[in-house]
Amino acid sequence: MTNERYNARESEPRWQRQWDDNAIFATQNDDPRPKYYVLEMFPYPSGRIHMGHVRNYTMGDVVARTMRARGYNVLHPMGWDAFGMPAENAAMANKVHPKSWTYANIATMKAQLKSMGLSLDWSREFATCDPSYYKHQQRMFIDFLAAGLVERKQSKVNWDPVDNTVLANEQVIDGRGWRSGALVEQRELTQWFFKISKYSEDLLTALDRLDRWPDKVRIMQRNWIGRSEGLLLRFALDTSTTPNHETEVEVFTTRPDTLFGAKFVALSPDHPLAAEAAKSNPALAAFIEECRKTGTAQAEIDTAEKQGFDTGIRAVHPFDPSWQLPVYVANFVLMDYGTGAIFGCPAHDQRDLDFVNKYGLGNLPVVCPEGQDPATFVVTDIAYDGDGRLINSNNGFIALDGMSIADAKEAVAKRLEAIALGNRPVAQRQVNFRLRDWGISRQRYWGCPIPIIHCEVCGVVPVPIKDLPVKLPDDIEFDRPGNPLDRHPTWKHVACPQCGGKARRETDTMDTFVDSSWYFSRFTDPWNEDAPTTRAVVDRMMPVDQYIGGVEHAILHLLYSRFFTRAMQATGHVGFDEPFRGMFTQGMVVHETYRKLDGTFASPAEIRIVADGDNRLASLLDSGQPVEIGPIEKMSKSKRNTVDPDDIIGSYGADTARWFMLSDSPPDRDVIWSEDGVKGASRFVQRVWRLVSAMAPQLPAPGTRLDAANHPAAQALRVAAHRTLSEILAGIDRLRFNTAVAKLYVYVGELEAVLANAPQGGLGGDPVLAAAAREAIDILVLLIAPMMPHLAEECWAAIGHSGLVSEARWPEIETALLVSDSITLPVQVNGKKRGEVTVARDAQNPQIEAAVLALDAVKQALDGKPVRKIIIVPQRIVNVVG
């Protein structure tokens, strides 16, 4: 051995070639060992990986390598989420075909991922734009259609005027398209929908089973599904005020207890009664048209200014036939939630209060907080939505004053269920969900074609299974926005599979979130040409044991995947309903920003930073021009605060980048990119190499074990090794990689101390200590292998092992070594903790008392007062009473 510096540039490619040549990460589906499936969300092939990818895939790789070392048959695949608008945008901007652009990017990014040393089974690789993949997606669409899980219907949709496509509600962020940033409009189109709402209750209740998911993700899904219990309430209408003598309007409410506070009824702009009234009211028609210029997403509607139009129609209050409420058309009422109509109780709903304050309708509080005087309780600008007792809620029909909200709801429900309007009860109990069906139609080329043919005679006809896949044509033009498939001269013209007559293909393609809603199941057997899955294999390998990705996908991707898995189960493609047993959401990689004098951003590579006392000053490298150091933000191309992984790997090596990503902060929090932190990680790589290099010549052969029970130094080393092994396993099992890293820093220091204190002439002069050191250094290399695999391979070879550390099994923890002969007890004085005392585990009470009273903290707390008694709870706590 030599003490030369570790050369990552030479070492890392060499070990990567060995892994590839031996296909050691290829998973065998018939392996009898217990399986473990770890998966990071697969990337969109945008062109290059970024530091967020490095962090995400490093975390997954640590889990995969650790579980493999523990004896599991690990599935750790990789593929590409390859359809989507960016490819079409690139085609328009650069005159390149989306397919060429996509596959070129895949080649680049695959090489980058390989340079990270990830333990991926590349034999299972696919891109969602491969016809061999989307063939099966088309097959499942047809199966879902036959099972009643797909529907084609007219619908108001979110239209992105820049991307010229439809967006799901979840893809509208603050009123703008999630990719283009354009203000979204409403349009009425015929669309294909997956009937996710059919599973609303199941998707909600099953969240309780997902105990290895973050609470915040489950809460987000619960809120999005939005279960609410209430009343379907029928308001009679004054027929003298309705356009065609309509007699009633139905309202869904979760707060029937507040009916005495009602001030108006509001209709969605798309409500049939609103449409009928608009026929004879041009001003109302214009208002409705204005409402349609905003998107259909709930979040956008909630934040928009509340606007309404008094239709002149009057509704009759169900508690009093002489009490009439004005009927408005309002921009905040959604047609596809409930009935498309609401009653407004402004005192107890902020949206309604904003509305009545704008239109001068007034408000009447009907719930009073406990402890407030009902006679003086008023609401002005802030609605009261808390608990309390009913007030102002008595008449000859019903008396609610003094009731709790729950009791009042029940009383109203029973009273209105017992009376009729026409031949039906005025009210009936109903459960509603916020979740709406998933519109999957997209008016673009680069997506999975929907396998449908439209025939004037036969109607909607699925493409025969034998004719799948319906492939995208290559000869398309991107000379203007819109869907090139609509303009293609031949592709869409086909014969009807049923009657043979002239027909046309469906030119909409599927939302790209469909592609990512089942890829994890396809990874289990991507070689099956006849079916999306091989049941025996997918049911054995799924669900994914550990899924890793960003919290931004909590609703979009994760909820869609849960639905899609249920749909696959219903059509016989899988035998389970939940795709991900464990879910982990990692934090982002962030970096400070740098703004030049002209207001534009500079990249970190263009900046020099120097310390000036307590301040840091930044300037441009080329001109020396001062630069403002801005806030720390998510790495993004627009802020130019990105760091190229290739530069870091080229300068320091992949292991340094991996170690930094794992060590700097808890994995669920953002990590601040720091050049100093990277340099520190690089120093640790060299530190480990120096330790191994120095110790290797002094070690006995691999496998040497000698009894260390009567050798204090050797026994202490074995205790440290197995304690660290236990701590690292616990850290990785909890995905607390930063704590595992911290334990390794401590352990390396302990091994360095052993080397420094070795007998003169080295460890070889003490065979028992040398044997313990052999075991300890083996464990060190095994423990760093999931995190710094290239360095670990180099060290494994250096200490005399013939195989690859990536194929080595971790040793079993000797639990007897983890039992300490001492115990640390908290010490209280008069019930308040003052310190701790460490005593022998078998110490008797007099020994414990003496040790406690000798503590300076106890003496200070007693302040000369006599000790009345000492209470010792064995193995738990000591309390001194003074």
UniProtKB/Swiss-Prot annotation:
* Location of the protein in the cell: Cytoplasm
Q: What is this protein called?
A: Leucine--tRNA ligase
Among Pfam families, the record links this protein to: Anticodon_1, tRNA-synt_1, tRNA-synt_1_2, tRNA-synt_1g
What domain of life does the UniProt record list for this protein's source?
Bacteria
**Sequence intervals crossing the membrane:** none
Tell me the protein family, please. Belongs to the class-I aminoacyl-tRNA synthetase family.
GO molecular function terms listed in the Swiss-Prot or TrEMBL record:
aminoacyl-tRNA deacylase activity; ATP binding; leucine-tRNA ligase activity
Q: One GO cellular component from the entry?
A: cytosol
| Binding positions for ATP per the UniProt entry | 637
Q: Which gene encodes it?
A: leuS
- Annotated GO biological process: leucyl-tRNA aminoacylation
Concerning InterPro entries, the annotation shows: aa-tRNA-synth_I_CS (IPR001412), aa-tRNA-synth_Ia (IPR002300), Leu-tRNA-ligase (IPR002302), Leu_tRNA-synth_edit (IPR025709), M/V/L/I-tRNA-synth_anticd-bd (IPR013155), Methionyl/Leucyl_tRNA_Synth (IPR015413), Rossmann-like_a/b/a_fold (IPR014729), tRNAsynth_Ia_anticodon-bd (IPR009080)
Keywords, A to Z, come to: Aminoacyl-tRNA synthetase, ATP-binding, Cytoplasm, Ligase, Nucleotide-binding, Protein biosynthesis
Q: In the record, which residues are listed under signal peptide?
A: none
Positions occupied by motif 'KMSKS' region: 634-638
**Which reaction(s) are listed as its catalytic activity?**
tRNA(Leu) + L-leucine + ATP = L-leucyl-tRNA(Leu) + AMP + diphosphate
Tell me which PANTHER family the record gives.
LEUCINE--TRNA LIGASE, MITOCHONDRIAL, LEUCYL-TRNA SYNTHETASE
Q: What is its EC number?
A: 6.1.1.4
